Amino acid sequence: MNNIITILCIMGGLILLLSLLPKNSNFLDIRSIFVQHFKVFRGNRSQFFSIFIVPILFSIGIVQIRCVDKDILNNLNIVLSILIAMFFSVLSILSAIDGQTRRDKYQQLLTETFTTTIFEIILCLLLLLISFIVLFIGVFEKTVILKIVSGIIYYLTIVVILNILVIIKRIKVLFDNK
């Protein structure tokens, strides 16, 4: 029974992912958000490496210590809900900043910060979706699948935390140069 549920969840996730990735989609163009976010790291491979590659090492290490369980996922869901609300608040603050009267670099930083915040919302929603699916399936025996899913959850969580630091730094620069 659990194998059928797992297969259905994987198939549903893949179909959903494929429906969100088409280029120039008027529904939700996640691809362009990801491309714009990764352009922020253009010319600075060390920051890209630190924010997106190093967390792989951390997540592999954490999975060896402990896979996700019901308690971890419940706490993560609470934190993610708070973060999503916070990111929407940050978006409203960024929208209120008038970047048109500023110089080009200020406007570029404002746009990049806005894009990074949207990227964070998407990561949090993805993490929340994965977390809910694992909770609904409710199988927490140490299997290869649980280790892989735990690694993905830990990886995305670390990436979210590191990107929060990027957003904080950018918002500070925006307000210092106001």
Regions inferred by a protein language model and the residue ranges of each:
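Alpha-helical membrane-embedded segments
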Residues: 9-17, 150-169
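Transmembrane alpha-helix detector for multi-pass membrane proteins
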Residues: 65-100
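Membrane-water interface of transmembrane alpha-helices
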Residues: 14-29, 87-102
